[in-house]
Amino acid sequence: MPKSTIRIATRQSPLAMWQALYVKEQLQIAHPSLVVELVPMVTKGDIILDTPLAKVGGKGLFVKELELALLSSRADIAVHSMKDVPIDFPEGLGLVTICEREDPRDAFVSNHYDSLEQLPAGSVVGTSSLRRQCQLKALRPDLIIRDLRGNVGTRLSKLDNGDYDAIILAVAGLKRLKLTERIRSSLSAEQSLPAVGQGAVGIECRLDDHDTQALLAALNHADTATCVKAERAMNTRLEGGCQVPIGSYAIWQNDKIWLRALVGAPDGKTILRGERLVSPEDAEQAGISLAEELLDKGAREILTAVYQGNTAI
């Protein structure tokens, strides 16, 4: 008998709830008689807000509790922002669906300046991401980068209170929360290469739950999945988490996949870059070879220093 109800494990932040409701809506469009319930929960990454993410340690800060709900059958699927999904999954769980990607770029948000270029020397810019930090420091070593934690609303409040001259957020998150007017400019991939999977929503479930996987098939966006899998293959070879200075971005260029990647020292003084243009069937292998190229250039030393806690600005 076909499954009649699906329970979605989700974080409680407004953006996470948007993602879960989006998946609920898409499931009910594809399967009108399906009952979809949300199971909101709090993750470690939501609780520890007074410490930079890179120093909290561990992988899966925003997903572990959701995965426990899957393993204990309190939920059938977990909905994630792909940039938060670790490279490894607990035994019995896996990523089965990747939805169509929203704009993956980073957004420059400020109340007084229209672009990164307009910021005066000494301006304070907020971000919790070492990936954004290293690229900002490389572009503008005269800026002061300060840690910025909390959900999107909290971060915007800190900007509005005058704690920062500008902050960097994901374009996708602002668009999904109907806050597009806060975007003063979008950073190009040359200015700020996006995070692995940025802008895409992924769905995790139990690998033996074939009924649920069959229901999810309608939500998978093949072109997005090809790109994100290439980005994740690179990240896997680098053994990267979601809180390290790694960028990876794949797009379709005619019938090829153009994959770009970087690893940067947090101080921005060293940025290693590489790219590949390959057939879609070779995209994941291209991610692996691109990672090996970056490792040969010195990425291992940069990442080892980060894992040892050397994230000083």
Swiss-Prot record:
InterPro entries per UniProt: HemC, Porphobilin_deaminase_cofac_BS, Porphobilin_deaminase_N, Porphobilinogen_deaminase_C, Porphobilinogen_deaminase_C_sf
GO biological process: protoporphyrinogen IX biosynthetic process
GO cellular component, one term: cytoplasm
UniProt keyword Transferase, yes or no: yes
Cofactors required: dipyrromethane
Enzymatic reactions: 4 porphobilinogen + H2O = hydroxymethylbilane + 4 NH4(+)
PROSITE patterns: PORPHOBILINOGEN_DEAM (PS00533)
Pfam families assigned: Porphobil_deam (PF01379), Porphobil_deamC (PF03900)
EC number(s) recorded for this UniProt protein: 2.5.1.61
Disulfide linkage: none
Pathway the protein contributes to: Porphyrin-containing compound metabolism; protoporphyrin-IX biosynthesis; coproporphyrinogen-III from 5-aminolevulinate: step 2/4
Keyword list, A-Z: Porphyrin biosynthesis, Transferase
Cofactor info, note text: Binds 1 dipyrromethane group covalently.
GO molecular function list: hydroxymethylbilane synthase activity
Note: The porphobilinogen subunits are added to the dipyrromethane group.
Function of the molecule: Tetrapolymerization of the monopyrrole PBG into the hydroxymethylbilane pre-uroporphyrinogen in several discrete steps.
HAMAP family, alphabetized: Porphobil_deam (MF_00260)
Family (UniProt): Belongs to the HMBS family.
Assembly, per entry: Monomer.
Protein name: Porphobilinogen deaminase
Taxonomic source organism: Proteus mirabilis
Gene designation per UniProt: hemC
